[in-house]
Amino acid sequence: MSEQLVAVGVLSRPHGIKGEIRLIRYTDSIDVFLGEVFLQKSNSLPKKAEIISSRIHQGVALVCFKGFSDRSAVEVLRGQTLLVSRSFLPEIESNESYLCDLLGFSVVLDNTDEVIGKLEYVSFPGGQELWSIITPEGKEVLLPAIPEFVLEVDTNAQLIRINPPKGLLELYK
């Protein structure tokens, strides 16, 4: 597959009886959730799919796929990652970045420049952005990605400066 695919969400659970499924989205824009997309189970290859409708209901994104017309049919999609071609992503400002572009960046403490590790993964449990940072020793450090803790992202240097809450890093030693 030559085009670059970007994860934009994870399918959660069916909604109603007409084939809609909840989507935990990684993007604010709902526009990317129409037309040709790709679905991926765990570590398998992505498969093409088509979203025929998308909407926001009580703050939750709901999508409906072609060929999935009822609740039991869409149940098989639960837990799959929704991917789109990078070319479908909306333009962003020069001072913004897509999360997928930050993966692999070095994460350092703001006050000492000590390297904590590399940004490995981003998840959204309970709607809160949570960064998984892998230390040089191979340990995982989880950091809530809020402005108080993430001070600077330098895309040119591929560097993220953080000021974690007191005691957080000690939990992982």
UniProtKB/Swiss-Prot annotation:
UniProt function note: An accessory protein needed during the final step in the assembly of 30S ribosomal subunit, possibly for assembly of the head region. Essential for efficient processing of 16S rRNA. May be needed both before and after RbfA during the maturation of 16S rRNA. It has affinity for free ribosomal 30S subunits but not for 70S ribosomes.
Localization recorded for this chain is: Cytoplasm
Q: Which organism is it from?
A: Lawsonia intracellularis (strain PHE/MN1-00)
Q: Give GO MF terms, alphabetically.
A: ribosome binding
The answer to whether the entry has keyword Nucleus is no
- Predominant location of this chain? cytoplasm
* Record SUPFAM superfamilies: PRC-barrel domain, Translation proteins
What gene is this protein a product of? rimM
Q: What's this protein's name?
A: Ribosome maturation factor RimM
Keywords associated with the record: Chaperone, Cytoplasm, Ribosome biogenesis, rRNA processing
Q: What does the subunit section of this Swiss-Prot or TrEMBL entry state?
A: Binds ribosomal protein uS19.
Question: What does the record list as GO biological process?
Answer: ribosomal small subunit biogenesis; rRNA processing
Name the domain of life this protein comes from.
Bacteria
Entry similarity comment: Belongs to the RimM family.
Listed as disulfide-bonded, the cysteine pairs are none
Where does the PRC barrel domain lie?
94-168
Q: What is known of its domains?
A: The PRC barrel domain binds ribosomal protein uS19.
